[in-house]
């Protein structure tokens, strides 16, 4: 089987976190096709630790409404998805992301209300017709989360190869109890993240944003090669 390297490279290069979608419906058949390819991702000892909840229509709207209320509750705990003592190079990248993202929305660094309003769009899945919630057994160790990352990337690239776009969203992990209650899950499950899935609105300004990436030589270390 011949592999089309240029085509694969184009799929990888065109994948980005899309934050504005068209309402165009996505068929269950197409979503199932994407998941059926993503399931081939590798995992430690073939444990395959992933579980997906696929929402559209009324269920998606109902979950979004509940999450919107929770997000706007000032007593809700923030999501600590990065350590307070973040190393300088990671902090600088995070700050650059905030500068570019919120700058595009013309929101000042000190405008907490504006930032909360924009981040709240996460919970409407950025207008995408399909929302995905990913869960994992809570007693699994960090290596299974590595497996999960491989699965998520495979799913996103498979979706992209079919003309769809995605946005992986760790923000959903902030509301573990709410989402687990909605999905009728017990405490043996943990929310990994959410994901928006649909066709990108190419006319939306937010989708023009491209984040900088460090060049490969900045983090790659070769040993034993001639040059």
Curated annotation (Swiss-Prot):
Keywords: Flavoprotein, FMN, NAD, Oxidoreductase. InterPro entries: Nitroreductase (IPR029479), Nitroreductase-like (IPR000415). Binds 1 FMN per subunit. It holds the Pfam family Nitroreductase. NAD(+) binds at residues 45, 102, 107. The keyword Oxidoreductase applies. It catalyses: 4-nitrobenzoate + 2 NADH + 2 H(+) = 4-hydroxylaminobenzoate + 2 NAD(+) + H2O. One of its GO terms (molecular function) is oxidoreductase activity. FMN binds at residues 15-19, 213. Signal peptide: none annotated. It comes from the Bacteria. Its cofactor is FMN. Nitroreductase involved in the degradation of nitroaromatic compounds. Catalyzes the conversion of 4-nitrobenzoate to 4-hydroxylaminobenzoate. Required for the catabolism of 4-nitrotoluene. Belongs to the nitroreductase family. This is 4-nitrobenzoate reductase.
């Amino acid at each position: 089987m011949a592999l089309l390297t240029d085509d694969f490279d184009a799929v990888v290069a065109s994948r980005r976190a899309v934050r504005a979608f068209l309402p165009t419906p996505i068929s269950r058949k197409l979503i199932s096709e994407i998941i059926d390819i993503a399931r081939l991702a590798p995992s430690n000892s073939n444990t395959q630790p992933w579980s997906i909840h696929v929402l559209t229509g009324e269920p998606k709207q109902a979950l979004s409404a509940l999450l919107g209320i929770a997000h706007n509750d000032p007593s809700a705990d923030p999501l600590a998805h990065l350590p307070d003592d973040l190393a300088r190079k990671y902090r600088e990248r995070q700050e650059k992301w905030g500068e570019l993202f919120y700058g595009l929305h013309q929101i000042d660094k000190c405008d907490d209300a504006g930032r909360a309003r924009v981040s709240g769009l996460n919970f409407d899945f950025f207008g995408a017709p399909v929302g995905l919630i990913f869960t994992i057994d809570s007693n699994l160790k960090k290596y299974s989360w590595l497996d999960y990352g491989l699965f998520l990337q495979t799913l996103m690239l498979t979706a992209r190869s079919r003309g769809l776009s995605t946005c992986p969203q760790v923000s959903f992990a902030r509301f573990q109890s709410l989402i687990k209650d909605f999905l009728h899950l017990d405490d043996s499950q943990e929310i990994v993240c959410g994901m928006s899935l649909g066709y990108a609105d190419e006319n939306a300004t937010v989708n023009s944003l491209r984040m900088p990436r460090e060049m490969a030589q900045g983090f790659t270390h070769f040993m034993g090669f001639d040059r």
